[in-house]
């Protein structure tokens, strides 16, 4: 996969991290570190967290800063993003608490082509139809030159996909408490159109362990009602917030299991 972008070191609020796209990374940093879009009340001091769609690792780094005893299982299928994720974990001494896997999550194991955007790596997707629509909207709102700059140079790369429950059984066989799987305190899903497939890859034995879920969805995709129905069926209370920067486009679904 030929990609020319060289990761750039960024210093922000006592956090150093490498970024493939500085503008995109700063936007994501603001969402997570300033706007606290993933803050969940009442997490324990040592939460077990699944980061589906880890990108360059900003969410995992934020959670390790907030919860130093956290154990995080992070998934990132894009090779370039995974390499930068690994560098960022090492740079911030987070390797001991975060296990990063170079694969994506889905409802079934296999291999699929990922559309990778060098200038917007966080938008890389298994569902390119969604990004085609976003590109068309960017042309209308900002002009073709800007849209081409953001979405241009896309390449296809085959990536490995696994089911979350299969991975949990592999690393935490039999759900033994001494191996850290008494509970899954937070399942964060930000996978650019494949959110429902990720959730379908969780078996009932593991849904019973999940306390909180946060899912980002793109409204025009039409899958939000299906995601909410699945989570409600699993016993969660649902709330939904619109993204301030694009309230008619993106929603953040928060699902909490009541004790």
From Swiss-Prot:
Keywords: Antibiotic biosynthesis, Methyltransferase, Transferase. One of its GO terms (molecular function) is methyltransferase activity. GO terms for biological process: antibiotic biosynthetic process; methylation. Pathway: Antibiotic biosynthesis. It comes from the Eukaryota. Its EC number is 2.1.1.-. InterPro entries: FkbM_mtfrase, SAM-dependent_MTase, SAM-dependent_MTases_sf. Methyltransferase; part of the gene cluster that mediates the biosynthesis of sordarin and hypoxysordarin, glycoside antibiotics with a unique tetracyclic diterpene aglycone structure. First, the geranylgeranyl diphosphate synthase sdnC constructs GGDP from farnesyl diphosphate and isopentenyl diphosphate. The diterpene cyclase sdnA then catalyzes the cyclization of GGDP to afford cycloaraneosene. PANTHER family: EXPRESSED PROTEIN, METHYLTRANSFERASE, FKBM FAMILY PROTEIN. NCBIfam families: fkbM_fam (TIGR01444). Belongs to the FkbM methyltransferase family. This is Methyltransferase sdnD. It comes from Sordaria araneosa. The gene is sdnD.
């Amino acid at each position: 996969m030929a990609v020319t972008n060289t990761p750039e070191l960024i210093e922000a609020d006592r956090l150093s991290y490498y970024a493939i796209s500085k503008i995109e990374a700063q936007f994501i940093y603001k969402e997570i570190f300033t706007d606290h879009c993933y803050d969940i009340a009442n997490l324990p001091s040592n939460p077990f967290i699944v980061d589906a769609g880890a990108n360059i690792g900003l969410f995992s780094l934020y959670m390790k800063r907030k919860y130093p005893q956290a154990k995080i299982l992070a998934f990132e299928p894009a090779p370039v993003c995974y390499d930068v994720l690994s560098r960022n974990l090492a740079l911030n001494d987070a390797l001991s608490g975060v296990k990063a896997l170079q694969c994506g999550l889905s409802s079934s194991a296999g291999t699929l082509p990922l559309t990778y955007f060098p200038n917007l790596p966080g938008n890389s997707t298994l569902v390119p139809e969604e990004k085609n629509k976003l590109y068309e909207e960017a042309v209308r709102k900002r002009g073709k030159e800007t849209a081409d700059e953001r979405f241009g140079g896309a390449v296809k790369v085959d990536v490995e996909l696994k089911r979350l429950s299969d991975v949990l059984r592999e690393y935490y066989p039999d759900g033994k408490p001494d191996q850290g799987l008494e509970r899954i305190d937070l399942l964060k899903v930000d996978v650019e159109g494949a959110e429902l497939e990720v959730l379908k890859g969780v078996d009932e034995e593991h849904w019973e362990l999940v306390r909180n879920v946060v899912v980002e969805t793109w409204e025009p995709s039409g899958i939000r009602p299906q995601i909410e129905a699945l989570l409600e069926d699993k016993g969660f209370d649902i709330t939904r917030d619109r993204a301030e920067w694009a309230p008619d486009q993106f929603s953040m679904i928060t699902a909490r299991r009541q004790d």
